[in-house]
Amino acid sequence: MKTAVAPLAHEIPSRVQDDVVTELKDIYIEKGTPMFMRTVLALFCGGFATFALLYCVQPMMPLLSREFSVNAAQSSLILSVATGLLAVGLLITGPISDRIGRKSVMVTALFAAALCTVASAMMPTWHGVLLLRALVGLSLSGLAAVAMTYLSEEIHPKHIGLAMGLYIAGNAIGGMCGRLITGVLIDFVSWHTAMLVIGGLALIAAAVFWRILPESRNFRPRSLHPRSLLDGFTRHFRDAGLPLLFLEAFVLMGAFVTLFNYIGYRLLAEPYHLDQALVGLLSVVYLSGIYSSAKVGALADKLGRRKMLWATIALMLAGLALTMATPLALVIPGMLVFTFGFFGAHSVASSWIGRRALTAKGQASSLYLFSYYAGSSVAGTAGGVAWHLGGWNGVGLFIGALLLVALSVAVKLAKLPVLPGNMPV
């Protein structure tokens, strides 16, 4: 009796080999296809709305300090409560998306956050505003937790760095436009009107996202059983690289948010006395982040994430050093370089998550972003204490300490062995 053996690859007729290749290509979305364009445009809109809704309040902090009679650290809560609840929500919405799917969770999240922002514009009390900002953050966790996972599942691995970079470019443009629009508008209209404008723009972005994002093709439902969830979290923390990437997210985002939370206070005071509208216009430094997130993401695909991560953190340190100088001609370029480095580093680190997490990718993305937004919330408010104690020098020392931790983590990540079955990263 003869045993049947599978034919070797060179024995398979070329027509069949072509069919096999075509089938594999159909699993992933390839660069240059209409599906790729729809996907990156939709996620760009989602990233835009997320960061615009979160960070539109940052230029308003000095104004809110005066209007509600709160200090700088208390004023920073309008951002910290949103990012803090977003971080908590990530631990819930990520696993939910692993069970029920990606697109429905993201669409619901965007519309809910936009509507909460519109409602916050009508709130007359500080505590009422903080409550709705907390709901904005909780809602946005549904997009933030799932977007990275969706891309890692649907986009071909060789293009994931570019796709993730374009998504983060949407974050950068949203953060810039949110700050720019409110920063300029509050010189001419009330902060309530400025918030209504941002909420309206986010509703438009949510509608575009809903209409053009392709449905998932590679999604496989996972159990929501507590044991299954615990196994996923345990597996990620046993990995040599993922906990380091989670720590990297915390310190990088903490440094970035702290700088932009308090640079406005510095520029409105002596020796600059800049107008509020002019301080708001400085949000154009985000343009460097728009470029770096896509460019560095693509370079990481070619040169490796290990090299690009520490290099972009070094750029952040150089930018911080420039902001410590007194001349405005050095401070503004420093903000530009710092922003370029941050978005480049975030693009590299976030695309690395999908390469390290071989299972339960939604949970891995949620843990990364939990750390990311926890860093924003904790360090963003702690920076207010540094400002109170030492002014901008105190803030600079605090940010510098965070970046030195980030650099040491990047060096450790560069020394990790490549996972079996993965290409070098």
PLM region descriptions:
Residues 69, 101, 122-128, 156, ...:
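Helix-breaking motifs and short loop linkers at transmembrane-helix boundaries and internal kinks
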Residues 112, 116-119, 127-135, 329-337:
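Paired small-residue
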Residues 306-349:
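C-terminal transmembrane helical hairpin of 12-TM major facilitator-type secondary transporters
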